[in-house]
Amino acid sequence: MSSRGHSTLPRTLMAPRMISEGDIGGIAQITSSLFLGRASVASNWHLLQARGITCVINATIEIPNFNWPQFEYVKVPLADIPHAPIRLYFDTVADKIHSVSKKHGATLVHCAAGVSRSATLCIAYLMKFHNLCLLEAYNWVKARRPVIRPNLGFWRQLIDYESQLFGKSSVKMVQTPYGIIPDVYEKESRHLMPYWGI
């Protein structure tokens, strides 16, 4: 159990691999049956086959599915803008990832860059099916794909979802000199030094 009273991921999921083509590229293994990546990963038939991926969840409005017959495709038509209603898809996508896993398949969730939309959906899945609080789920995904950065509207929706699931929230929106941001971003920004030029 974690310090927040939530269980952590099973030990069998504790050592995922990261297959990298650079920080922004590549595919990150989030659990034994869940992968997160950018759109170019979904176009790599050999990579999908090699990872045992059977379902591709496309969280974009701008990128079409490849519709190869070997894979099941799910389209989640979302723009990467703060007011996009990603919360409407949390349960549907999480349930699909879980269903694919129960059938011994694997799911790739992708958006354009694998940074905001797809990361948000993976975080929601970890909260629902692995009983992680939002902070734990975010840190878990970020450790495997360091470039993730859900937009501020998605954070608000994740915070609401966590409150619905667990009756409390582990991440807060805070006022900073940069505007209102999730406290996890505020903690990250403390390590940044302003550069004023010389």
From Swiss-Prot:
The active site is at residue 111. GO terms for molecular function: MAP kinase tyrosine/serine/threonine phosphatase activity; protein serine/threonine phosphatase activity; protein tyrosine phosphatase activity. GO terms for cellular component: cytoplasm; nucleus. It holds the Pfam family DSPc. Its EC number is 3.1.3.16, 3.1.3.48. It catalyses: O-phospho-L-tyrosyl-[protein] + H2O = L-tyrosyl-[protein] + phosphate; O-phospho-L-seryl-[protein] + H2O = L-seryl-[protein] + phosphate; O-phospho-L-threonyl-[protein] + H2O = L-threonyl-[protein] + phosphate. Residues 26-167 form the Tyrosine-protein phosphatase domain. Keywords: Hydrolase, Protein phosphatase. PROSITE patterns: TYR_PHOSPHATASE_1, TYR_PHOSPHATASE_2, TYR_PHOSPHATASE_DUAL. Involved in the inactivation of MAP kinases. Dephosphorylates ERK, JNK and p38 MAP-kinases. Plays a negative role in TCR signaling by dephosphorylating MAP3K7 adapter TAB1 leading to its inactivation. Belongs to the protein-tyrosine phosphatase family. Non-receptor class dual specificity subfamily. This is Dual specificity protein phosphatase 14. It comes from Mus musculus (Mouse).
